[in-house]
Design a protein with these regions (language model features):
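Loop-centered beta-sheet repeat module
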Residues: 146-194
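Short beta-strand segments in beta-sandwich/barrel cores
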Residues: 262-263, 279-284, 298
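Functionally critical, mid-to-C-terminal surface segments that flank or help form catalytic/ligand
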Residues: 211-269
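Short acidic-glycine-tyrosine-enriched beta hairpin
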Residues: 156-168, 285-305
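Ligand-binding loop in jelly-roll beta-barrel domains
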Residues: 80, 88-93, 124-127, 173-192, ...
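Transition-metal
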Residues: 1-138, 198-228, 252, 324-325
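His/acidic/aromatic-lined binding-pocket segments of jelly-roll/cupin-type domains
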Residues: 85, 94, 111, 117-120, ...
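Short, basic/aromatic beta-hairpin or loop at an interaction surface
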Residues: 137-149, 269-282
Length: 325
């Protein structure tokens, strides 16, 4: 069994740039690449396997052929793959938006998932910032009025960002990624977004992009959001590690490899998704077989994969799993 290299699905939203192609080698001919969906079984864009005997299969098809063995105990209890991992290149400001939780989505959105997410800032322009939650508690009526007056950003916390910052965005948290930020986003497998402000932009059809005011008012937590997470790395011989997020949908770990690190088989507990965010390395498995990995590569190790190691000098990975609870 070999690690599976994944080809992402691409989205060309109007605010996207070209960094994912220019700096991360993403093979896409779109004029702009706003998002690459690196790990996705979502019908709006599925990852495709690039190597092995499964080359050309969608990730969803591959997992469903042996569901429990490939997704692991943590996700096997679910009827669909619970996680999406994406890269976001915000060349322009994203809309001010919010995502519902599972309960609201399943009632009002035909059984769709809600969306809790984790952001890892891979890079950013000097002075870049994002808007996150409110700067004071508002009533629902105050929030609705601010939306209709186009002043909602005046009531939000503006947070300057730097490379390596981490944010955990629970469903119901109003937010907006600012221009000049490159983010790795680990989220529930959902494409539900309720926009409340979009800078009066028009979409590809020449019409203003739709706002979703009443649904947003229903689901938004109208109080200040928790700040960024400053999570120190814990050093071990040859590598460092930090737990970035841990929730029922996903567990995210940052791995910084300085020489090498060995990892045991998961024992069927969870798949492992590895996203190389910086540097280059070798993934060594099956008694010495080495697979080269470079910045931007996205790899899936099914839950029945064996022990492996990562070897390299100053390379960084985000490791995503869905662990048993």
């Amino acid at each position: 069994m070999e690690p599976l290299k994944l080809l992402p699905a691409f989205q060309d939203y109007i605010w996207g740039g070209t960094r994912l192609r220019d700096e991360y080698g993403k093979p896409c001919d779109l004029e702009r690449i706003a998002e690459s969906w690196e790990l996705s079984c979502h019908p709006a864009g599925e990852s495709v396997i690039m190597n092995s005997v499964y080359k050309g299969q969608t990730l969803k098809s591959y997992l469903e052929q042996d569901w429990a063995a490939r997704v692991g105990e943590g996700a096997a209890r679910l009827s669909a793959f619970p996680v999406m991992v994406k890269l976001i290149d915000a060349r322009q400001d994203l809309s001010v938006q919010v995502h519902p939780d599972d309960r609201y989505a399943r009632v009002h959105e035909k059984g769709e998932n809600g969306k809790t997410e984790c952001w890892y800032v891979m890079d950013c322009d000097e002075g870049a910032a994002l808007a996150l939650g409110f700067n004071r508690e508002l009533t629902k009526d105050e929030f609705r009025r601010a939306i209709k007056q186009g002043t909602v950003l005046d009531w939000m916390q503006l947070v300057p960002v730097k490379k390596g910052d981490v944010f955990f965005i629970e469903a119901g948290t109003l937010h907006a990624i600012g221009a000049g930020i490159l983010i790795a986003e680990i989220q529930q497998s959902s494409n539900l977004t309720y926009r409340v402000y979009d800078y009066d932009r028009v979409g590809a059809d020449g019409k203003p992009r739709e706002l979703h005011i009443e649904k947003a008012v229903d689901v938004t937590k109208t109080w200040p959001a928790p700040p960024r997470r400053n999570i120190p790395l814990t050093d071990y011989q040859g590598y460092s590690v930090a737990l970035l997020a841990d929730c029922p949908y996903f567990t995210v770990t940052e791995l910084h490899i300085t020489e090498g690190a060995a990892f045991p088989a998961s024992g069927g507990r969870s798949y492992t998704h590895l996203l190389c965010t910086d540097g280059e390395a070798a993934l060594v498995y099956d008694n010495g077989v080495a697979m080269p990995v470079v910045k931007g590569d996205s790899l899936l190790l099914p839950a029945n994969f064996g022990a492996y190691s990562l070897r390299g000098k100053h390379c960084t990975f985000l490791c995503t799993q869905t662990l048993p609870r």
